Amino acid sequence: MDATQGRRHTADAGGQGTADADAEQFWERHYGTRRAWDAHVNPLLAETAAPLCPGVALDLGCGPGGDTIWLAQQGWHVTAVDISTTAVERVRDRARDLGIAGRVVTEQHDLASSFPAGQFDLVSAQYFHTPFAFPRGRVLRTAAHALRPDGLLLIVDHGSTAPWSWNQDPDIHYPTPTEIAAELDLDPEHWSVLRAEMPGRQATGPAGETATVIDNVLLVQRRDRSMAA
Ligand SMILES: C[S@@+](CC[C@H](N)C(=O)[O-])C[C@H]1O[C@@H](n2cnc3c(N)ncnc32)[C@H](O)[C@@H]1O
């Protein structure tokens, strides 16, 4: 993957990248037509990161940026990445409005073709789903390789369909944490699975309705110091 092709959104940087036009348009429409921009940290990320000493984090598919903003507010330096230019621009603007712009860099990437440069203490992939063909296993494996020694990769996926979800495909299969770990295909000599669980939680839909939904959670730690770049 080419780390140079993303479009960086800071006060002082610009550039052009390539992206799958359909996927980019889809997610641009998704965020461009979104009036409410309410974004909160995922509790599973907060639970994982709260005990850690703040370092350098990467938020893959940051979307509205609730996770990025929360991490930056805890003292982390965060690179927030999304295929949607609207999403990353809004995260950048929100960070600026909150006075934490110095700890947030936003970059537009189609992660199928480019990946941000750097080494990270924490990589977070929260509900990193897309309806388009996407080499997710390869991207997440690249993320695992971008970890510093002792760094953590937290993947939180949907494990069930909420009644208000835009995707009600009855045949949808949500990969289990074990299946996600198998897709990553990481050498157990160098990466450890710290958590592979499917907890339920009470979720609230856009109209205030509630339902129990499942999250598929995988937490991986890089162990091998000799492999770090
Ligand atoms: C289901 S949303 C989750 C957003 C956010 N992480 C959250 O928890 O609310 C999936 C996110 O992945 C982004 N995404 C989809 N395909 C992508 C790609 N090829 N490269 C980078 N980001 C992508 C979307 O724009 C979207 O923001």
What residue spans do the PLM features occupy?
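A short, conserved alpha-helix within the catalytic core of class I
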Residues: 130-143
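Class I SAM-dependent methyltransferase SAM/SAH-binding core
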Residues: 68-111
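Core SAM-dependent methyltransferase catalytic element
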Residues: 204-229
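Conserved beta-strand signature within the Rossmann-like core of class I S-adenosyl-L-methionine
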Residues: 150-158
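A short acidic, Gly/Pro-enriched loop at the edge of an enzyme's catalytic core
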Residues: 115-122
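Conserved class I S-adenosyl-L-methionine
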Residues: 1-52, 55-63, 161
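Short alpha-helix
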Residues: 173-189, 195-196
